Amino acid sequence: MDVKDLRIGDIVGIKTLNNGKTFCFIQEIKCDGDVCIVSEDEDPFDCHVSTLLGVKAEHHHFSNMGAWYDDKKVEHIFTFKGGLRIAIRPQVGTENYTAARIGEYKPKYCRFTYLHEFQHWLWDMYRISF
């Protein structure tokens, strides 16, 4: 994988220390090499592109967004370059959807059943906002 193949808002797999895998958002791409900033909630960290396990964007079969996270936390908040804040609230149940909202004031929630659907919404929001 190459940095030029990535976009802000991409959902990527990251290797964990115990050889597991977690999913993160790309929040910023540094221009000085093969490094991007990703996060698990509001804990951003630098990540070399060689450690990425692949972009999840076009994986239509990954349908259960509620399975992405356990539902012990109410919301997972991500802050992107330029100040775009998104909160993800997994809803586990009959429909398995996720609600996402933008901003601190008068948040607007949108429902998503498919990860792919959420990915396109995120790309569009980032493109329109900045």
Regions found by a protein language model. Name each.
Residues 1-3:
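Short alpha-helix capping/helix-loop boundary micro-motifs
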Residues 11, 19-32:
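Short beta-strand-centered aromatic/proline hotspots
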Residues 18-19, 64, 96:
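Detector for Asparagine
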Residues 41-68, 110-128:
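Intrinsically disordered, low-complexity, charged/polar segments
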